[in-house]
Amino acid sequence: MRTDTPQAVNLADYRPFPFAIETTRLVFDLHPTRTRVSAELSVRRTGGKNEPLVLNGERLKLVSIAIDGRPLAAGEYGVDAERLTIAEAPDAFVLTTEVEIDPSSNKALMGLYMSGGRFCTQCEAEGFRTITYFPDRPDVLSRYSVRIEADGKFPHLLSNGNPVASGSLDGGRHFAEWSDPFPKPSYLFALVAGDLDVLADKFITMSGREVALRVFVDPGQASRAAYALDSLKRAMKWDEEAFGREYDLDLFMIVAVRDFNFGAMENKGLNIFNSSLLLADPQTATDLDYERIEAVVAHEYFHNWTGNRITCRDWFQLCLKEGFTVFRDQGLSADMRGAAVQRIKDVRALRARQFAEDAGPLAHPVRPSSYLKIDNFYTATIYEKGAEIIRMLKAILGAPAFRKGCDLYFQRHDGEATTVEAFIACFAEASGRDLSGFFGWYEQAGTPSVTIETAYDAAAGALTLTLTQSTSPTPGQPDKKPLPIPIAIGLLAADGRVLRDTEIVLLDQAQMTVRWDSIPEPPVLSALRGFSAPVNLSTDARPSDRYVLFGSDTDLFNRWEAGQTLARDLILTRAAGAPDEVGEERYADALGRALVDDAAEPAFKALLLALPSEPDLALMFEAADPAALHAARDHLRTRIAVHLGDLLRRLHGEMQINGEFSSDAAAAGRRALRNACAEALSADPHAENLARLLGHFGAARNMTDMIGGLYPMVAMGGVPREKALESFHHAWRTEPLVLDKWFAVQGRDPNPDALERVIALTQHPDFEPTNPNRLRALVSTFANFNPARFHDPSGAGYAFLADEILKVDAFNPMTAARLVEPLGGWRRYKPELGDLMRAQLERIVAHPNLSKNVLELASKALG
């Protein structure tokens, strides 16, 4: 049992750092086990005379320390496990330190570490302190110059900014020097050294400047980086057109690494990417991989302005860069891949991750007020809900005023570390609007619930809407205030005609009433169009109204939403023991009509075919029964497969593409619908369907179709599963990114023996627990996306996850902490399951030498 109590960091305690670090000169003498790092800091006092200089530093061996060239005696400084302190520092001086570190033993993958025989870094949020002594906080901006010395077997020596010198050294070594003219915080520092292939291109900015583009990858992988490089050029062009942002250095580099805790990192001029989000070709990457690469390349590039040029004053302001940048990358994806389809995908992800977060013990505001480890706040709330707040701001202000606010923010705060308050102030000033109430979205946790009741007066031709809002208590916030919620509303007639186009109603109080005149007939309400606010909506709509929306709504998000709501209600009523056989048949008929709508794109139809997920359905209950939900959902899947079998088989054939592979949205949409039909048909595995599915998998000529065929085979179990998995592994056993997919498909296996198989897979020769991609592919997929088997009545699934968390925590606390979340929802499940989940959380918290990362999340989950 732990006896120490880690100290929380509180927003209220923020104080500016009392010194400026005007320039930082770093010299790296790279060696896998004994790297020497020399740091020369130009320091100037900006705070009180009596304040000491306190620098962060962890796992560093101090070799030397000097001020203005004079070595310090032992009594002139102090060093402990987390910091270096100089009690009596001069007002202006040059501090020189030399430390020794061991990159090869760094399995936490924070700071400087080895991956695939190369050196690389990850410094956000607090990794730089494991490289050298420094004020490792985002409000200390410094101009960096870097010299890297290494053996010739590491031919590429890369860092931030522009290259300024390179050459040979004695003993087969060489060097490179880099200079970054833009002040940056330590979390944006980056270094890569290794044997890499490079793919080169250029981009001409809107002012006519030529920027060299370089993507560095493992030898032999350059062709797989072509799509990422093309995505980068599209992102650079889009940001110029949409936000007026131009790139500022002469060189932009991206490096792919296999071992990486995050998806990617926006280091100034030297982005480092998880290889799973950079490398793609039709044979090894799915359409989803292509989508993610396009979005993440854009996200990290967009950070050059929303994160790098303007950064966060402190880590409580993390949403300032992440929420805004997610909003921006979603905008690019909408323009590239279709606004409605992209919006549906974004909202599905928001509900699956962020709504669940808001509904549980880990709920926190978009701008938190305290933390133990900031690593734990890289959450869906910060990112996705943060983006939704920006989207609402644009809806409330209108596009022109929103753009004025963005321009003012970029102009006013360029080169600063700033706050959410300063951000919102720019939009208030640019629009002339009072946005003080809007700030509540940043301070208040929880998902608001909005109710709309309608009353139609036929004689007067008037519709009255009564809107109410409320937010349930969340940890530390028992009382909630009304928030300004933009509700996009339109009206349809019973035959699907448009009666009233979309209008924004701003619900900014607990209850309000809106009256609309000149409504000639009883309307069907289409509310929260485009998912205009991150809320749970309840209306007095009848099933017949929802079928009108499902068949005719001009807002495609709400058309999809109506279908999801109808399916959800049918699944929930069956799970509760009151099946609606007539309703299930009516739903299947309506779905069939939607699937033959020639005006609808295949990508949209694929989304219509996907039933609500079991985790999303569980959020509808106070004491969910995963087994009952799984059985009820499977029943509806089977009803659809039987009722629409001929149509599904016809669409499956029609959507086949025989020509050359294209990654564009139209071709991806056809593949998505074809694979959705295959998965739907697997719910009715008679001989004709089985033969079709075997043919789908066997004839697949790209990874999208191969994975689309593999999962139905796995779901069937028995001989089809074993043969398909064996053949896939044999074909792709030397491709790490494809093997991740092989593990992930088995993590989703719905068969009763799935848990036993997943546990066995952790002993498979290809399972790499120290690689976050492989760990997430199997363990995280099982715990998050296979609820029927994770929630095994014996509790064995929970024990397995707890075992993995404790194993991984010993060497990679950040990745271990991200595995805690599936146990955190224990209150939402029936007591016999919830008690077993809670017991595993208690076991985790009681474990000796537990990291702060895991302790914080597990303790909060227990409440």
From Swiss-Prot:
SUPFAM superfamilies referenced in this protein's UniProt entry, alphabetically: Leukotriene A4 hydrolase N-terminal domain, Metalloproteases ('zincins'), catalytic domain
EC number annotated for this UniProt entry: 3.4.11.2
Reactions accelerated catalytically: Release of an N-terminal amino acid, Xaa-|-Yaa- from a peptide, amide or arylamide. Xaa is preferably Ala, but may be most amino acids including Pro (slow action). When a terminal hydrophobic residue is followed by a prolyl residue, the two may be released as an intact Xaa-Pro dipeptide
Lineage: superkingdom: Bacteria
Top EC class of this enzyme: hydrolase
Cofactor binding mode and count: Binds 1 zinc ion per subunit.
Short name of one Pfam family: DUF3458
CDD domains reported in the protein's UniProt record: M1_APN
Disulfide bridges in this chain: none
Cofactor requirement: Zn(2+)
Keywords associated with the record: Aminopeptidase, Hydrolase, Metal-binding, Metalloprotease, Protease, Zinc
InterPro entries assigned to the protein according to its UniProt record, in alphabetical order: Aminopeptidase_N-like_N, Aminopeptidase_N-like_N_sf, PepN_Ig-like_sf, Peptidase_M1, Peptidase_M1_dom, Peptidase_M1_pepN, Peptidase_M1_pepN_C, Peptidase_M1_pepN_C_sf
Active site: 300
GO molecular function, a single term: metallopeptidase activity
Biological processes, Gene Ontology terms: proteolysis
Residues noted as binding Zn(2+) in the record, renumbered to the chain: 299, 303, 322
Residues noted as binding substrate in the record, renumbered to the chain: 124, 263-267
Site (Transition state stabilizer): 383
Family: Belongs to the peptidase M1 family.
Role: Aminopeptidase N is involved in the degradation of intracellular peptides generated by protein breakdown during normal growth as well as in response to nutrient starvation.
Protein name: Aminopeptidase N
Gene responsible for this protein: pepN
